[in-house]
């Protein structure tokens, strides 16, 4: 189904561009907003986003724009692909223009200092808007190159989910729906932390047993933490949980994996992030997740270990020794799903 009005995508990064392309390929008129006029002009003239998605042609139906006020006025369905550190700053001045809009967050991050997810920030800024999120095993370049992909749109608003499914669903991109917005969004944010650890392990040439252990124990940690906050544990067995975790912890295309790999090669955190040239949400998420898990007394040894390496001066060897000598635990915590 084609929307009667143009659809907005806010953000000029790789994921925003990939989603804008999908929408345009499905016959939607798309306005992709970005702050940088030079970037917008490059996309307009070269039909390519050379900074973030080099080599991928931008569909003619995608119009790069820099006038945010007009974009918000012209569009009803708005996909928000802004970094977690910028979302509030960009949208707060346009609060009135967001009333009654359908706002769908694509950002897998947590706001520093508040521990708010992106949809919670959108609710604060635009309490009269209708809110949803998209998350899943979705590497931007693979989406743009038409690899078969599935994602999850989550909202308590069934009509919003249906409209997003109709707008995005295509021959290579399948969209499932969920009502557990909090769990879907939390899964997308948390897995970024473990992707850094997976990249670090790969750079150190650790074995397949080790990598498998990291992914499965990461899933246990994520689920334990999310359930404590009220998420449905079953969400973490789906695309937005284990699906996203596997792809992000296995693929060199993942930004957070790349940061971890650079650290394993001997670069400092600052050098690793700088080499990326694009936001890796996992670094910021790690800081707030460590603080929150300590506050809530949730057992998260992998989070504590990675935090010790990145911010406390511990070596990987020291952390491995502490993890392997830790108190024996059960493999799986059985969590009742009644009430979700």
Swiss-Prot record:
HAMAP family: NAD_Glyc3P_dehydrog
Annotated GO biological process: carbohydrate metabolic process; glycerol-3-phosphate biosynthetic process; glycerol-3-phosphate catabolic process; glycerophospholipid biosynthetic process
Reactions the enzyme catalyzes: sn-glycerol 3-phosphate + NAD(+) = dihydroxyacetone phosphate + NADH + H(+); sn-glycerol 3-phosphate + NADP(+) = dihydroxyacetone phosphate + NADPH + H(+)
SUPFAM superfamilies: 6-phosphogluconate dehydrogenase C-terminal domain-like, NAD(P)-binding Rossmann-fold domains
UniProt-recorded name of the protein: Glycerol-3-phosphate dehydrogenase [NAD(P)+]
Binding site for NADPH: 14-15, 35, 108, 140, 255, 281
Protein encoded by which gene: gpsA
Pathway recorded for this protein: Membrane lipid metabolism; glycerophospholipid metabolism
Class of the enzyme per the UniProt entry, highest EC level: oxidoreductase
Organism expressing this protein natively: Pseudomonas aeruginosa (strain LESB58)
Keywords for the protein's UniProt record, in alphabetical order: Cytoplasm, Lipid biosynthesis, Lipid metabolism, NAD, NADP, Nucleotide-binding, Oxidoreductase, Phospholipid biosynthesis, Phospholipid metabolism
């Amino acid at each position: 189904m084609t929307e009667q009005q143009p659809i907005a995508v806010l953000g000029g990064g790789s994921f925003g561009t990939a989603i804008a392309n999908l929408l345009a390929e499905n016959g939607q008129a798309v306005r992709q907003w970005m702050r940088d006029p030079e970037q917008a002009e490059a996309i307009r003239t070269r039909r390519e986003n050379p900074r973030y998605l080099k080599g991928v042609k931008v569909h003619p139906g995608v119009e790069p724009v820099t006038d945010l006020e007009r974009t918000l006025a012209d569009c009803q369905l708005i996909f928000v692909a802004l970094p977690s550190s910028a979302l509030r700053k960009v949208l707060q001045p346009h609060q009135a223009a967001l009333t009654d809009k359908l706002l769908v967050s694509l950002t897998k991050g947590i706001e520093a200092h508040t521990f708010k997810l992106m949809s919670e920030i959108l609710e604060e800024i635009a309490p009269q808007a209708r809110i949803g999120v998209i998350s899943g095993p979705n590497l931007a370049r693979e989406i743009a190159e038409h690899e078969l992909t599935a994602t999850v749109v989550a909202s308590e608003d069934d009509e919003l989910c249906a409209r997003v499914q109709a707008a995005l669903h295509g021959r290579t991109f399948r969209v499932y729906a969920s009502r557990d917005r909090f769990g879907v969004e939390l899964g997308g944010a948390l897995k970024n932390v473990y992707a850094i650890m997976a990249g670090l392990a790969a750079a150190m040439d650790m074995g397949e047993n080790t990598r498998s252990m990291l992914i499965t124990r990461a899933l246990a940690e994520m689920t334990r933490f999310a359930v404590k906050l009220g998420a449905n544990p079953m969400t973490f067995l789906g695309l937005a949980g284990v699906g996203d975790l596997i792809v992000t912890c296995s693929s060199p295309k993942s930004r957070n994996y790349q940061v971890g790999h650079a650290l394993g090669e001997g670069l400092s955190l600052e050098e690793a992030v700088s080499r990326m040239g694009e936001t890796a949400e996992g670094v910021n998420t790690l800081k707030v997740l460590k603080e929150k898990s300590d506050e809530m007394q949730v057992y998260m040894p992998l989070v504590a270990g990675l935090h010790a390496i990145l911010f406390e001066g511990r070596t990987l060897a020291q952390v491995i020794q502490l993890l392997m000598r830790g108190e024996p635990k059960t493999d799986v915590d059985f969590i009742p799903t009644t009430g979700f």
